[in-house]
Amino acid sequence: MIEVTKPRAIALGYFDGVHLGHRALMQKAVERAKQIGGTSAVFTFDVHPDSVVMGRQVPLLTANAYRRDEIKLLGGVDEVIFGHFDERMQHMDWRDFIHKMLIGQFHAGWIISGRNNRFGYKGLGNAEGMAVECEKAGIGYDCIEDIKVYGIEVSSTYIRQLIAQGDMEGAAKFLGHPYTVTGIVEHGRRVGTSVLKVPTVNLRLPSEMALPPYGVYATRVLVDGKSYIAATNIGVKPTFVDGGAPTIEPHLLDFSGDLYGKMIHVELHKFLRPEMQFESVEALKNAIDENIRQTRDLFAEE
C-alpha cells in the first residue's frame, strides 16, 4: 500500500487514451514526486464531465474498465485516483477543489495541469488561478504547455476526429502509440472458421468507445505477452448478419489455439477497406485473402 501520509505530486486531467500531452503531465508528476519525497498520482474522474454537464455520452479512446491500467502502464505513475463526477462535483467551487479535495483529502504537495485545463463550477478554475492558490497553500505547481504535432495541438477531441475518419496512422502520431481496443474474447457464430476457413476471435466493442469506420484493418494483437499480426474486421458482418451490435474480429496470422476468455489488446495500424456486403462467400474469401496479403506486406516493412 502507498503511504497516504506522503505528499503526492498530482497530475490533473481526464487522460482518455493517454496521448502525448497526458504523458508530459505524468512525466512531470513522476519527476516532482521524487523531488518532494512523495508519490506520483493522476487525479481523474470516473465519467467524462461532459456526460454529466452536457447530458451526452462522449466517445472514449479507452474503455472505462481499462483506464486505470492504461494510465499506469503508459504514464508510469504510482497511482490513479478516480473522483466521482456528479452534480455535487459539478457545482464545487474551483478553490474548494484545490484546497479541500486535492490538498486536504489527497495530500497534494505538487499539482501539475495543462495550460487549457478548466475545473470547478462552470470551469472557472484555470492555470493562472491554480498557480495563485498553490502558492498560498505553500505547495508546488507546474503548468505544462500544449504539445503540438505538425503544428496541431494534441487533444483527445482531435484524436477522436482522426479515428472517426479511419486515419489510424494520424491517430497514432498524436497518441504516441497505436489506437488500441481491449477486451475479453467471446464465443462468436464461428462463421470465420466453419464457412470462410479463416478462424477469428470475437470481441464486443464497448458501447462507450470511439468507433472507427466499419471495415477491415491491419492490426497487431497482444495476448499473454506475445504479439501477432492480424487482419481485423470491425462492424456488423452484413454478408452473414442482418443488423446487430458491432464487433471486432481479428484473424491472427500464424497462430493456432484457443483464446476464449482471455484479455487481448488489438492495435489498429491501418484502414484497409470499408465493410461491405458481398454477393457470394467466394467473393468475400477473395477479399479476405487480399486483406491478409496487405497486412503481411505492411508489417514486413517495419
State what each model feature region is.
Residues 188-302:
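Phosphate/ribose-recognition catalytic cores of enzymes acting on nucleotide-derived substrates
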Residues 49-137:
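N-terminal Rossmann-like or analogous alpha/beta NTP/dinucleotide-binding catalytic cores
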Residues 19, 71, 111, 171, ...:
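Residue-level signal for inorganic ion chemistry
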Residues 1, 87-90, 147-152:
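A short acidic, often aromatic-flanked loop/helix-cap motif at beta-alpha or helix-coil junctions
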Residues 134-236:
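Glycine-rich, Lys/Arg-enriched anion-binding loops that position phosphate/diphosphate groups
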